[in-house]
A protein has these predicted regions:
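C-terminal catalytic lobe of FAD-dependent flavoproteins
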Residues: 130-132, 157, 291-365
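Short beta-strand to alpha-helix junction loop
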Residues: 60-74, 141-157, 268-273, 340-341
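Flavin (FAD/FMN) cofactor-binding and adjacent substrate-gating region
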Residues: 73-166
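Helical element adjacent to the flavin cofactor pocket in flavoenzyme catalytic cores
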Residues: 138-192, 196, 201-203, 351
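Active-site substrate-recognition segment that forms the wall
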Residues: 7, 14-25, 32, 48, ...
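Conserved N-terminal glycine-rich FAD pyrophosphate-binding loop of Rossmann-like flavoproteins
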Residues: 2-4, 36-66
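Eukaryotic N-terminal targeting leaders
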Residues: 1-5, 23-28, 37, 355-365
Length: 365
């Protein structure tokens, strides 16, 4: 049987999911190379800092929306049948303020906070809250059952699933994407390289995509558990500040955030932002602390900053050839990498298969 050597560059949620789907075909021999691996916490490595939850942002009818629709069944299946993945069901309440519609956070969440969103027919238990149940200043709100992902469990779980299928993991730092073709664990040149380097695609040789930019998110993880997830379209603290609360599975703590700061590379948690994040979280869901405690009642595990790998024209999922190396790109997913991970990986795998089929056909001539 013919075998095909594939190198996936990047070990965030996009790279790991792509490697997992590729490795399900026995003929594919997959090597994953990355500067950062699950267990690392680094400003360049966005996936560990994610909330992470399923909250669709894509505009109705867009590729983004279809990717989110197509990924939901996989996340739902993991929550139902493989709780060891660190994914569990959580109710979420989304609050919308019309005055946020022209802010960075309001535009980011416009579809999510719509009173009639496209995803209402397939997420679980969707309902619009009656107007008499809305908090002051809220124009509409919705509630549904989503999933929350404990990234500290899920990313290593993806690694373990890849390894069960024979994937080999190697740390490496590349200056040029074409170098990846020489890093396959077989010692032979790769048939295809899959570029899942996220924000690094901005500077990686042979890619150097100037459409890629960071969107800074500052969060904190606390031990407090309010019992369900909550989010809102914006805040009065600034157009790029927002509030969300995500209790993670398996003792992962509760993520509270956050910020949506485009082109901000600052890797250090800002104490002023941290204070505002805590104040907003308590206002959004007072159940976080006992009555009368205030922010002093928040038991902080850690502060963190992640740079969402956004791209001006949206994710790049396409075939390429760089210095004679066949490349498939899958990067630029911004703050929605988890909730499009499976569908975008499936598209990337389809492109890899096209390249392999072409190589196979030429070899027969």
């Amino acid at each position: 049987m013919s075998t095909y050597n594939i190198v996936v560059v990047g070990a965030g949620v996009t790279g790991l999911t792509t490697a997992l789907l590729l490795s399900k075909t026995p003929a594919n021999k997959v090597t994953v190379i990355a500067k950062h691996m699950p267990g690392d916490y680094d400003i360049e490595y966005a996936s560990p800092w994610a909330g992470a939850s399923y909250m669709p942002f894509g505009k109705k009818g867009s590729d983004h929306a279809e990717w989110e629709r197509a990924t939901w069944p996989a996340l739902r299946d993991l929550a139902e049948h493989q709780p060891e993945s660190g994914i569990h069901f959580q109710d979420i309440t989304i609050h919308n303020r019309l005055k946020d519609q022209n802010t960075a956070t309001g535009q980011w969440s416009a579809e999510l906070t719509s009173a009639n969103p496209w995803f209402k027919d397939f997420v679980l238990n969707f309902q619009n809250l009656p107007r008499d149940q809305l908090p002051p200043g809220i124009d509409n709100a919705q509630r549904f059952t989503s999933v929350c992902i404990n990234t500290a469990i899920y990313l290593p779980w993806l690694v373990s699933q890849c390894m069960k299928n024979g994937c080999v993991f190697k740390r490496a730092v590349l200056k040029h994407i074409s170098e990846a073709a020489e890093t396959h664990h077989s010692g032979k040149k790769a048939n295809v390289v899959v570029n899942c380097t996220g924000l690094a695609s901005r500077t990686l040789g042979g890619v150097a995509d100037d459409q890629v930019y960071p969107v800074r998110g500052q969060i904190m993880i606390v031990r407090n558990d309010p019992g369900s997830m909550t989010s809102i379209s914006g805040s009065d603290d600034g157009g790029d500040e927002v509030s969300y609360i995500f209790p993670r599975a398996a003792g992962g703590g509760t993520v509270i955030g956050g910020t949506y700061q485009k082109n901000n590379w600052d890797p250090l948690p800002d104490p002023n932002f941290a204070n505002r994040i805590m104040q907003r979280a308590l206002k959004l869901d007072p159940r976080l602390v006992k009555e009368g405690q205030g922010v002093e009642g928040l038991d902080i595990v850690r502060h963190g900053v992640g740079l969402r790998p956004a791209r001006t024209d949206g994710p790049r999922i396409e075939k390429d050839q760089v210095d004679g190396v066949k490349v498939v790109h899958n990067y630029g997913h911004g703050g929605f990498g988890y909730q499009v991970s499976f569908s975008c990986a499936e598209k990337a795998v389809g492109l890899v298969n096209e390249i392999i089929q072409q190589q196979h056909d030429r070899a027969k001539l």
